[in-house]
Amino acid sequence: NIDKKVNFSEWYNTIIYASELADIRYNIKGFLVHRPWSAIAFRHIYRLFENELELDGHQPVIFPTLIPEENFLKEKEHVAGFSPEVFWVTEKGNEKLERKLALRPTSETAFYQMYSLWVDSFKDLPMKLYQSCSVFRAEKETNPFLRGCEFLWIETHDLFETADGAIAQTTTDLEIMKKVATNHLSIAFLPFERPQWDKFAGAEKTFAYDCIMPDGKAFQFGSTHYLGQHFTKAFDVGFMDSQGARKNPYSTCFGPGIWRVLGAIISIHGDQKGLVLPFVIAPIQVVIIPIVKGDAKEAVLNKADEIKSILATSGLRVHIDNTDKTPGFKYNWWEMRGVPFRIEMGGREVAENSATLARRDTREKAKVPISDLEKTITALANAMQNSLLEKSQNELNASIKTALTMDDAKRILDELCFAKIFICTLEMDGKRCADALKDFTKGGKVRGRRLDEKPVSGKCIVCGKDGMQAYLARQY
């Protein structure tokens, strides 16, 4: 019963452990043990993204976890950006390795080394590959599903004959993120083009997907990068075009942060009772609670088994809780774990050939004939998805306020909101004003320009020069 709006950090950390999503007591700081409840949810989140990627022509691959140091050194911006975060392997058994090997922080320098061997002709393009994996970064401050030394994601690495083809892919990546995060997982978010000083190391442009957390901070749970020819030139990836000229392809990468997506789901949809999991990723979608009294025990348990069989046959993930805990304890337990629907089955329901169906997000209950259970749950699952999205969108919209001055910007961030501001430019010349804003607002970072809004002109709230609309927020 902690109010996440009042004390988000306490609420979040309490629910992570109480609902058995994860355990931080593994004896390496910053590394997390994922318990079955999160591991199963991750499996479903992965499938949603992988299905969309494969519909878009991507194919899966599995690359080694280790990347040799010489690969990093081939792209100067990339190595400068990631070196402070890299874990290095320097020994094998009792022997010192002749060269250092990195635990992958991201895999551009692995993929492009192989692309130089695989790509020869324009007929090989586009090449669109992805892998689902863990990556490793030496983070100083960690928090489960928000920031970690090891985390789960998907990374795509795509090659195109032309710049236009690569840039078009970044738009497709955004559409994939919308389909999964918004349509399936009910997460409202803002798509941004990041400022030039905040782009991915080695990219020409970075596009990122931010939601707002209950404490008013921006949370990036995915990004797409237009890499131009930076990596293809560095790794000598080339192809013969239709005229026989040798060229370097243009490339992109897309990183749906699977780990962070779950962090967003926990934070945005959860309430004072605990998790509220979207139907499509819930490890258990329907839990049946037999309410056993006296002579009705056998009939109640038989009816619970019958209902489970009916629903499981239709593809639903169903569990019967026949432990010796009280019904009240079971209700609270499964509500805390975010199971979308609860069926209460007692002697009265057996006599009426019905079930009492409770919905997790609204906590509404209704008596439903057993013959109608499957279609009722399907309809309510769609309603739940829409309701969660509407709530998420309303909260996001209410958290965006316009700042005409630096004082406005600080006040808005202190109100746990995003500030809509004007800044002179998002090119490198604007970094001085962005740094001034960060200092003045105690941590507010320029997120960039929204991709789904038309450009708006105005005077920079720092220097007064003609500028453009952007967003400011504190962040994770």
Give short role names for the model-derived ranges.
Residues 1-476:
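NTP/phosphate- and nucleic-acid-binding module
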